[in-house]
């Protein structure tokens, strides 16, 4: 069965990401491993590392339950704050052959920090794997 590595945070659970995952499922059985990078934004002036990690874990669990309820086979983990490092770290542990590709879900160009960092292209260059880039809208967690 094909597996896809999905990296998302603010767009995790968006209709656009769900559609991209379903498109892969339409091509045959597959499963998804979600990686939610720790995100240092949001309400509040300061966040501790444990608060950031807990927020990412909560966001991950809500998305995992939602995707599973919609019939998708999903596992997941919290990753490094950098989406590139988060993907590379998972591939170091599991191996590149464990995944058919990477789905990167970002905010729209006008507001995406990940796109300013060229994250989808950097993930492709660093991994040599096919990358599907999805532009989604933020989901309130």
Describe every region a protein language model picked out.
Residues 31-32, 53, 69:
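Positively charged, small/polar-rich N-terminal and surface patches that mediate targeting and assembly
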Residues 47-57:
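Glycine- and acidic-residue-enriched helix-capping/strand-helix junction motifs
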Residues 105-121:
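Glycine-rich, Arg-bearing micro-motifs that act as flexible, cationic patches
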């Amino acid at each position: 069965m094909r597996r896809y590595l999905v990296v998302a945070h603010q767009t995790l659970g968006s209709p656009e990401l769900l559609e991209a995952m379903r498109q892969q499922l339409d091509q045959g059985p597959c499963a998804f491993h979600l990686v939610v990078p720790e995100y240092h934004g949001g309400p509040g002036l300061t966040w501790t590392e444990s608060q950031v990690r807990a927020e990412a874990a909560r966001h991950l669990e809500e998305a995992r339950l939602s995707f599973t309820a919609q019939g998708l086979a999903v596992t997941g983990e919290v990753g490094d704050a950098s989406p590139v490092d988060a993907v590379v770290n998972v591939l170091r542990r599991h191996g590149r052959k464990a995944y058919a590709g990477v789905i990167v879900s970002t905010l729209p160009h006008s507001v995406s920090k990940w796109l300013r960092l060229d994250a989808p292209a950097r993930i492709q260059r660093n991994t040599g794997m096919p990358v599907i880039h999805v532009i989604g809208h933020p989901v309130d967690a």
